[in-house]
Amino acid sequence: MKTMAKMIGLVLGVALLVLAVPLWVYFPGHNFRTVEQGVFYGSRQMGPDALEAAIKKHKIKTVVNLRGTNPGKPWYDEEVAVCSRLGVAHEDFAWSKNRIPDPESLARFLDLMENGRKPFLAHCEGGTHRTGVAAASFLLLRGVGVEAARGQFGPFFNDAPI
């Protein structure tokens, strides 16, 4: 009977771990990445205090919002206000997490990566889909191979269409 209880405990422990890892990845504050030190960072949507701290810590000069222009939404208005107060450029791109960005928007993004004020902080809502596409596009622009670029999508998104 003790062996069966230990076995059940072990199975439940492993199941809990398997379920907890994805939640940890998506939990606020746990999705900030350095794509290229001093040049490009990616994250999930941050509140104003966390955004200000990240801007100051990494000396961010341009925040790239991949969620599109959303005046009137608190997260957007707070983000724009923080950037304005700190003298940081704020660029909006309306990218979908379900499809590849349209060619014009992708070209504008790549132009920003080449000619904009660095370092950049790109973000979407969760910091995975759209931010992964942005990070991978940046790395491909820098001449990094496709496999390394795919690494920006994490273990659950390796089938991303790049």
Across the structure, where does each feature detected by a protein language model lie?
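Cys-dependent protein tyrosine phosphatase-like superfamily
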Residues: 2-120, 136-162
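Short cysteine clusters
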Residues: 124
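Substrate/cofactor-recognition hotspot
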Residues: 127
